[in-house]
Amino acid sequence: MWPTNAKARAWARSAAAEMHSGFGPLRNICPMSCGVRVALHQPVPSGLLQDLQRLQTLWTEGLQRFGGPFLAGEKFTAVDAFYCPIAFRVQTYALPLSDACQAYVDTLLALPSMQAWYQDALKEPWLEPVHDADVLAFGALVQDQRAAALKPPAPSPP
């Protein structure tokens, strides 16, 4: 679950703790929603930009220090699991990242478990209007791939 190398493990635990307790603007402005694509309103809130800068600093440190392609080295570990929801947010909101950080996101999104998670999310048979409103509070819907959104409306009773 955690890296076997002591330095990588210590760094990974610290990075996971930061994900657990931080990135409030990112979480609030870009709620998790796999099946939609959202264009953020401009200008992008400064808190989100600050979170993206910190995220990239953190990811770049791990990728460079431990050689990638995952944050603490060659193998997917718990720290990467903590950042998987962020990979989906990057995809949903087209968040701007450096090439190295985007490559890390692409690596996460290509994992079979992430692909399964994404496909399962698309198949959910319901919509959540309150959550959808949160998702669109800072942006405009560009695309909706969710099965529930693609269903034709039920016929009206006579």
Regions found by a protein language model. Name each.
Residues W2, R27, L48, L52, ...:
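Tryptophan-centric aromatic hotspots in well-structured domains and transmembrane helices
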Residues Q42-R65, L71:
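A contiguous binding-surface segment within folded domains or other stable secondary-structure elements
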Residues A121-P158:
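Acidic/histidine-enriched, glycine/proline-rich intrinsically disordered or flexible terminal extensions
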Residues A39-L49, A103-Y118:
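Short, mixed-charge aromatic SLiMs
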Residues M1-S46, T60, A148-P158:
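GST-like domain detector, emphasizing the conserved glutathione-binding G-site
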Residues M1-W11, F66-A78, A100:
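All-alpha amphipathic helical-bundle segments outside canonical DNA-binding/catalytic cores
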Residues L71-P96, A100-Q102, D106-A110, Y118:
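GST superfamily/GST-like fold recognition
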